[in-house]
Amino acid sequence: MLSAQLKQQLQSIQALQQTLEEETACLKEKNFSQLSAILLKKQKLLQAVTELDKVLSPAKIQDQIAQSEDLLALKNEIEQQLAACQKINALNGRLVELSMKSNNLLMQLIKQATGKNSITYDQKGGLNSASLLGRNIKA
């Protein structure tokens, strides 16, 4: 029974890792249409992992795992997979941060472009702050 529970936990964590990789791809490609479904799937997997961890965490069960080479090997594999998930999740957090900064910068530029003293652009697409769309022309 313990072996089956550990295998189930490993499968859940492997599915979580795959989901995190899908999340990474969505964030890199800025494909936000699929992101909501991926986040829901991620939440369900995290919940399943947490619930099974509660079942497997009592000291009595941990002692049984420690006494069996097979169970201990499964536990070690689970811990390695979990560490990989944590690394991917940290990367995804950084991607979200960078995306938010990029969006904030874009919003500032759009606000400037639509403001009273709008900035114009030169032939190369660069900002040309010298001309404020002819507002100060007297002739």
Question: Which residues make up each language-model segment?
Answer:
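Short terminal interaction segments
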Residues: 74-139
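Extended, charge-rich alpha-helical scaffolding segments
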Residues: 1-77, 84-87
